[in-house]
Amino acid sequence: MSTRLLCWMALCLLGAELSEAEVAQSPRYKITEKSQAVAFWCDPISGHATLYWYRQILGQGPELLVQFQDESVVDDSQLPKDRFSAERLKGVDSTLKIQPAELGDSAMYLCASSL
């Protein structure tokens, strides 16, 4: 197989409808080549202290990758730490990075927040 296989990195916005508040996530869709770095960004609902990153592989339910309370990691037991990293600065926005991306990383990556 060619090493130039494309990995499909898709994500969708997961919003909460509280007086038009929503989680902002970008990019909405990401297609990349194998071995490239991928970064997703999430801006939670204002005032929400807890932030979650999920991965949903086609045909499966969502899997929690990491949970933050403000800047602190509460649970990252399912985060593949060899290539995945996540951070939340100042208890506000968060980034999820995959480097290098592999074909098996093809999934929806979802961000959510709560009080």
Swiss-Prot record:
Signal peptide: 1-21
One BP term from GO: cell surface receptor signaling pathway
Major location (coarse): membrane
InterPro entries per the UniProt record, alphabetical: Ig-like_dom, Ig-like_dom_sf, Ig-like_fold, Ig_V-set, TCR_beta_variable
Keyword tags: Adaptive immunity, Cell membrane, Disulfide bond, Immunity, Immunoglobulin domain, Membrane, Receptor, Signal, T cell receptor
CC annotations in GO: plasma membrane; T cell receptor complex
SS bond partners: C42-C111
Source species, domain of life: Eukaryota
Subcellular location field: Cell membrane
UniProt domain Ig-like: residue ranges: 22-115
Subunit structure: Alpha-beta TR is a heterodimer composed of an alpha and beta chain; disulfide-linked. The alpha-beta TR is associated with the transmembrane signaling CD3 coreceptor proteins to form the TR-CD3 (TcR or TCR). The assembly of alpha-beta TR heterodimers with CD3 occurs in the endoplasmic reticulum where a single alpha-beta TR heterodimer associates with one CD3D-CD3E heterodimer, one CD3G-CD3E heterodimer and one CD247 homodimer forming a stable octameric structure. CD3D-CD3E and CD3G-CD3E heterodimers preferentially associate with TR alpha and TR beta chains, respectively.
Job description of the protein: V region of the variable domain of T cell receptor (TR) beta chain that participates in the antigen recognition. Alpha-beta T cell receptors are antigen specific receptors which are essential to the immune response and are present on the cell surface of T lymphocytes. Recognize peptide-major histocompatibility (MH) (pMH) complexes that are displayed by antigen presenting cells (APC), a prerequisite for efficient T cell adaptive immunity against pathogens.
Name of protein: T cell receptor beta variable 11-1
Designated gene of the protein: TRBV11-1
